[in-house]
Amino acid sequence: MEGRIRVTEFLLSVPAIGTTKTQDALRRLGIAPSKRLGGLGRHQRLRLRVFLIEREERPVRRRKHLVVLAGPTAVGKGTVSAYIRENYPEVLLSVSATTRSPRPGEVDGVNYYFVDDAAFDRMIAAGDLLEHATVHNAYRYGTPRAPIEKALDDGRSVLLEIDLQGARQVRASMPEARLIFLLPPTWEELVRRLTGRGTEDAAEQQRRLETAKVELAAQNEFDHRVVNHTVADAAREVVDLMMVRPAPVRPSTA
């Protein structure tokens, strides 16, 4: 049965390799992407075995953490992430792509990559996004894959600020990722923050609050929860959690 598995699928199942590294490995090993394990020649099998042994012996400390920060609308994810970017240079904050228009003060390539729907479709088709989702039934957001894989291989910790849908996709594709849920002190404070920022009309505010209820109900899916009383304290707690040694993978109860 194992011999029928394509080498591409086999490599993608190895932790921390990913699509980009798999493609590079196949080129170096001289193995076609469509080749199956059972169809490898003797020299190809040997090269693949050596490649896997070398990866296994590589110092574990080089591979840092991928951490996802998610939470309901207006909880302050962007503000906390910006604080981490400015005050914790050892952490790489991933820049997402989005189809929405820039808000006042946002800079393309720093806060987001602002793209149109056609460009976003091309990124999906090319497999360039680690995750993507439509948020608030309006705009699409996605995380470019290549910068994250390169940063992790270079030994940097990476923080992704994404929504609940994206967090679930990352958990499915990268189980070793650490998921942190950012909470408001109270529901009333969340409503105050949303209505006070003045970037949405009343109908949009109501839609976002309904989405927030769904997101808050899913907080137990996350590894850690942080309450955003103040930006500095929440940011410090998120960074501290990024540096904690990961717990063993929990066995499935299925």
From Swiss-Prot:
Uppermost EC category: transferase
Pfam families: Guanylate_kin, H2TH_5
Residues at which ATP binds: G71, P72, T73, A74, V75, G76, K77, G78
Record's subcellular location: Cytoplasm
Any one GO molecular-function label of the UniProt entry: ATP binding
GO cellular component, one term: cytosol
Domain Guanylate kinase-like intervals: 64-243
This protein's record includes keyword Signal: no
Enzymatic reactions: GMP + ATP = GDP + ADP
EC number: 2.7.4.8
UniProt keyword terms in alphabetical order: ATP-binding, Cytoplasm, Kinase, Nucleotide-binding, Transferase
CDD domains: GMPK
Biological role: Essential for recycling GMP and indirectly, cGMP.
Protein family: Belongs to the guanylate kinase family.
Protein name: Guanylate kinase
Protein's organism: Leifsonia xyli subsp. xyli (strain CTCB07)
Lineage: Bacteria, Bacillati, Actinomycetota, Actinomycetes, Micrococcales
